[in-house]
Each structure stands twice: as structure tokens, then as C-alpha cells.
């Protein structure tokens, strides 16, 4: 971050800053004056919600941001996941996005990597939805509907 960055939080909201969890008891505005890794509560993905390939990738990167002390242990898992996704997806926008995520993580821009992954969710949903429709059509044909 090159400039200051201001965010507003509502009473009871949490923010994760450089691995620390901060909960506010009233509406506040925070201004970050230097580089900081943070994640708003609304962007935290719960383990049970990591139910698609990109959400699983997001969860891995999120762990790196929320627990920076364990980031080195998480990197091999991230590399394996990225390699698998790059080998599996055929959509050019997803592939370009995954390569961008990889470069952002390598540059230490973890929050930006999370934003880039979230931006790929709609494309992934289109792909998964088309796959589900195809499966349903095959099943219907097989059972004579």
C-alpha cells in the first residue's frame, strides 16, 4: 500500500490485521498509514464453505494472511493447489487469473490475491453450473426421461 487506507467498521465487527484479530465494540473508522495485511470479517471464508476449487484456493491463501507465522508451511500446499487448478481448468480467464494470483502471492500481496480469487468466482460458477446441467441431461437420458 503506497497511500493511507481508511475503512469503517460497525459495532461487533472483526478485522484481521497482520495475523491479529481485532473486534470493535462501536462504529469506528481505521486508517492504515503503512503497509498492512488485513481481512474484513465479511471476506473470511469458513472451512465448510470452501466447497469449490477456487474457494479451496481462497481458503489456503486466507490462512496465509490470517496466520502469517505459518505462511511458509502453507506455501507448498498453495503451490500444489495452483498447479492442479492450472492443469484442470481450460477457461482462459480462469487460467490468467490463477497466474495473476500466483504472482501476487509471490510479491507478498496476499489481500490482493484474495480479491483476485473472489473476482473469479462468477466464472467458476458458470463452469460448474454448465457441468451440473450436462450431468442432469445425461442422467435424464439414461433413465429415459
Curated annotation (Swiss-Prot):
Its job: Has a post-transcriptional repressor function in flagellum biogenesis. Associates with the 5'-UTR of fljK mRNA and promotes its degradation.
HAMAP family in UniProt: FlbT
Keyword set, alphabetical order: Bacterial flagellum biogenesis, Repressor, RNA-binding
GO molecular function annotations of the record: mRNA 5'-UTR binding
Superkingdom per UniProt: Bacteria
Family from the record: Belongs to the FlbT family.
Coiled coil: none
Organism of derivation: Chelativorans sp. (strain BNC1)
Annotated protein name in UniProt: Probable flagellum biosynthesis repressor protein FlbT
Pfam families referenced in this protein's UniProt entry, alphabetically: FlbT (PF07378)
One Gene Ontology term from the biological process aspect of the record: bacterial-type flagellum organization
Amino acid at each position: 500500500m503506497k497511500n493511507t487506507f481508511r475503512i469503517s467498521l460497525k459495532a461487533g465487527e472483526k478485522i484481521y490485521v497482520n495475523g491479529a484479530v481485532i473486534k470493535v465494540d462501536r462504529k469506528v473508522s481505521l486508517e492504515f498509514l503503512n503497509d498492512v495485511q488485513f481481512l474484513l470479517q465479511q471476506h473470511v471464508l469458513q472451512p465448510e464453505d470452501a466447497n469449490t476449487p477456487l474457494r479451496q484456493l481462497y481458503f489456503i491463501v486466507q490462512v496465509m494472511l490470517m496466520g502469517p507465522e505459518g505462511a511458509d508451511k502453507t506455501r507448498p500446499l498453495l503451490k500444489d493447489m495452483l498447479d492442479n487448478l492450472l492443469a484442470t481448468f481450460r477457461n482462459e480467464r480462469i487460467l490468467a487469473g490463477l497466474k495473476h494470483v500466483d504472482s501476487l502471492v509471490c510479491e507478498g500481496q496476499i489481500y490482493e490475491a484474495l480479491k483476485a480469487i473472489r473476482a473469479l468466482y462468477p466464472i467458476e460458477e458458470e463452469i460448474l453450473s454448465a457441468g451440473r446441467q450436462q450431468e442432469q441431461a445425461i442422467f435424464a437420458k439414461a433413465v429415459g426421461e
